Amino acid sequence: EMGLQKHIVREADMFTQYNPFDFVIGSTHVIDGVDVSQKEFFDGLSKKEAYTKYFESVLENAMLHNCYNVYGHLDYVNRHAPYEDNSVNYEDYRDVIDEILKTLVEKGKGLDVNTSGYRYGAGRPYPQMDILKRFRELGGEIITIGSDAHRPDDIAYRFGDAYEYVKA
């Protein structure tokens, strides 16, 4: 997995050219120097403002970068969000999410279904089903399953459930 940022396009491309990985998951973790998992990212922002900022950054990264095969945990922003209702309602961000998905389809990129949502209380993989279905409606064909494992015990965590989720 490679964290994508708008100011490292050249470096990311060079890194993947000189290190011929079999497969690269691109993702957005840091925006304007602040990690989305940190409280500071959300400080002073409404949920709508924070989530829009996140999705706009994902769109920018998806468009600028070519060094990835699939985009990972597309609705990750809600994992650490401090809001009482931290869910991502696809309809609230439809325009920008659709632009992200269209960009992936046009570039021949895929979407990674990430099972970490089961470990972190979402009760489902990332992205949510509405986003996955919309990706398919827009012509998306490449879907992978990943566990975002940071420990050996989490490798392939709930892949069976994720497989059924993708088939639904």
Label every PLM stretch briefly.
Residues 32, 84-168:
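Charged catalytic cores and adjacent phosphate/nucleic-acid-binding surfaces used
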Residues 1-106:
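Extended substrate/RNA-proximal surfaces in nucleic-acid metabolism proteins
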